[in-house]
Amino acid sequence: MNRKKNLSMSIMFENRKISNEISIPKTTPSIWIPSQNISKCYKCKDTFSIWKRKHHCRICGRIFCSYCADEWGIIPSLINLTSPPDNNFSLNSILYKERRMCKDCNSQSQFIKKSSLYIYIFTNLPLTFKELYDIRLVNKEWCKAINTILSFYKGVQYKLPCQELTKLEKKVLWNHRFEFSQHFFLMSKCLSSFKNGEKISALEQLILFYNKKITHYDCKKIACRRNCSPSPKIEEILEICSNEIVISNKIARLWLLNNFKLLKSSEIKMIIPWLINLGLKHYSVFYDIIIPLCSSNNNLIYSFFFECDFFMIDKILYYKLTPILNRFLQKLDSNIVKELYKTLDFVKFINENIFLNLSNSKWESQVNNWISERGPVRLPWDSSTVCIGIASEAITVFNSATKPWKIPLIVRNKNGEKIVNILVKFEDVRKDKLTMIVSKFLNNICKGLVDIETYNIFPVYETCGWIEMVEKSSTMYDIKHKYKTTLQNYIMDLNPNITVKKMREKFIKTCVSSCVLCYVMGVGDRHLENILVTKDGKLLHIDFSYILGDDPKNLKVEMKITEDMVNMLGGINSKFYNIFKENCSLAYKKMRLRSSLWYILLSYLNFSLPSIDAFKYTELVIKNHIIERLLPGENNSEASMQIIDIVDRSSKTSWTQNIAEFTHKISNTLREATQFNMEL
């Protein structure tokens, strides 16, 4: 009797239907779902009220009513305990070992307790996923035990880089490591979880195997995520780099360098600060990865040089980075090195002249003399564009709190000459820079759904930065209070040939961009002067001093959707508003697939030196923010319901927002000026 007949006999003796047992349980998010975003019980869908309170399940982290989460039990060690936020104190968690959980999680917990031996055995056996699928047909208990293992394995794919894996999860990944070739996401999870107990030779063998790029298993057989790809994504490479054992290995570093080279140079340019931070932990990363990667591309050369220059403001980092930077410059042509230092001197020269408070005529003579002596100078954020002069008559000092200067630079590139207006702000602009990096990634990831107008930001010191101003744009404050018109009329006046339908279709993209960007970044202090509208009707946010849910007025920070924006879409009951909501949901789904990327990008707030708001943006704060906003691991339907609910809620102007706008208008009237306006 062959194997298939044996399996069939076993199934017959069990006297059960295969279809009811064979499906793998859905993965649970294993995150603490924020209660303020949930209005209905996850199970029975009853609306919460004073009489129907919210309760978290300590395993899946979802929110239920007291009836649907009335089970209590001790959570097995195989299951990751869903931890509440630090500020969420419960006396029961100290007094009792038992934890509240929902009915589904409790039944799973009970099964894991009974079948822990089978789970441990099947986890440690050297079986492929295909063999595990076959063994499930032997009997019910084996089937459920293997399904539990597969459920844990699928759950690993939704964990953030900062979330610790259990021993069982690490074991599953390591046992199946040779099945992950050409599935870069799973390769990254496996390598990033490599632990001290394994031999270095095993790591090197695995790296060499992955380097052969042999595909043995398709995505369906190893239960990959939908966005699985043989090509690396930035967050996947950086997650591997976070493992100290892996990054300390020479073979691994060379393999990582080859994978970095597969990325676009524009993407590498954006993550230079993260690479420098990695190099400061492991100097060999500078020599084996960063210097070879950056020394062959002009834009990367400029980006690395000026990022190092900024990090070196910190005295300790100055001594650490000086030999690294010298080694980097030795690799470059002497003419490129001269150009780098010329640009650095030009930035210092402009800032020094601002502090001298020169007259416009003095400005012109000083800049012209400098350029005539040293020649045209390349811009620090774009080496292909050179500054050839300054339009001194248009130099302006804005009448806002920090008195920023507008410096109009005459520049030349392959498209000819033009004026680029630079706003020199006397405050830390690194949060603005981070937001622009996030915006650029959003444009790539949600292509077709969003259209974010981005601009260059260059931090000079921790108290000064240059911002490239967007041409032909006005604040929504000016449109409403200065021009005395609506957003729709303003755009139509500037674009007389556009139809209302075409205008609204175009506006949907920019409105979705505005909402998802502000939501994922937790952007606060959103008033009408911080939202610009370009000539062709694009919304553009500026001034990102308050992020991750901070707001100077202590308002709840979610999205800024004004009454004018809703009217532009045709009103809350219009077809275009419904398309806008649907596109917000689609963009949100795409963003959630890259949750690890957003976590890694926001980690800049924690490691950037000199420190940004010291001790405020800890790893825990960033992790909790990403979990609250993106719900990694939660199913798409539940997450979509949350984002649509937030869009609907934000579209209705609250009395607190009206008061905030009114006080802002009074403040503006008193100083009789508006910020960052460029007349059309």
Give each language-model segment a name:
Residues 2-23, 87-115, 120, 124, ...:
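CRL adaptor-proximal regions
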Residues 21-106:
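Cys/His-rich Zn2+-binding "zinc-finger" mini-domains, especially FYVE domains
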Residues 129, 147-302:
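Alpha-helical solenoid scaffolds in large eukaryotic transport, assembly, and signaling factors
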Residues 373-523, 535-540, 545-548:
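Conserved ATP-binding subdomain of kinase catalytic cores across diverse folds
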Residues 115, 130-150:
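Short helix-loop-helix/strand-helix junction enriched in hydrophobic and basic residues
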